[in-house]
Swiss-Prot record:
Belongs to the universal ribosomal protein uL22 family. This protein binds specifically to 23S rRNA. It comes from the Eukaryota. This is Large ribosomal subunit protein uL22c. Part of the 50S ribosomal subunit. One of its GO terms (molecular function) is structural constituent of ribosome. The keyword Mitochondrion does not apply. Keywords: Chloroplast, Plastid, Ribonucleoprotein, Ribosomal protein, RNA-binding, rRNA-binding. It is found in: Plastid, Chloroplast. It holds the Pfam family Ribosomal_L22. Its main location: plastid. The lineage of its organism: Eukaryota, Viridiplantae, Streptophyta, Embryophyta, Tracheophyta. It comes from Populus alba. InterPro entries: Ribosomal_uL22 (IPR001063), Ribosomal_uL22_bac/chlpt-type (IPR005727), Ribosomal_uL22_bac/org-type (IPR047867), Ribosomal_uL22_CS (IPR018260), Ribosomal_uL22_sf (IPR036394). GO terms for biological process: translation.
Length: 132
């Protein structure tokens, strides 16, 4: 049974499914941006020379748009609180070879989920709890 995570009112998320790249290559990028601020993450992703950066950049940008449009959160105070990559289904196709043979080609896919959290509300809650 999969446990559903409790939804924090100051969190926004975006998920991408069946992205055609290896989960190992996507994890290399995700490990660099986990825990960083939104603006710093965008700068890092724009400057990294890997093909995996573009779909991750789009997901981070989409999660920030969800935060600002749906919840009214400020993009300057967003931090990547959770970023994970899971393996998806592997697409298989045959490449024709000489003498009637064929070789199997495997195209790995992955599922990426990004969660952004607003840290300004965290400070507000801590201050509120100290007063009580």
């Amino acid at each position: 049974m999969i446990k559903k995570r409790k939804k924090n009112p100051y969190e926004a998320s975006a998920s991408g499914f069946y992205i055609s790249m290896s989960a190992h290559k996507a994890r290399r990028i995700i490990d660099q941006i986990r825990g960083r601020s939104y603006e710093e993450t965008l700068m890092i992703l724009e400057l990294m020379p890997y093909r995996a950066c573009y779909p991750i950049f789009k997901l981070v940008y989409s999660a920030a748009a969800n935060a600002s449009h749906n919840m009214g959160l400020n993009e300057a105070s967003l931090v990547i609180s959770k970023a994970e990559v899971n393996e998806g289904a592997t697409m298989k196709k045959f490449k024709p070879r000489a003498r009637g043979r064929s070789y199997l080609i495997k195209r790995p896919t992955c599922h990426i989920s990004i969660v952004l959290e607003d840290i300004s509300y965290e400070e507000y809650e801590e201050d509120f709890l100290r007063r009580i």
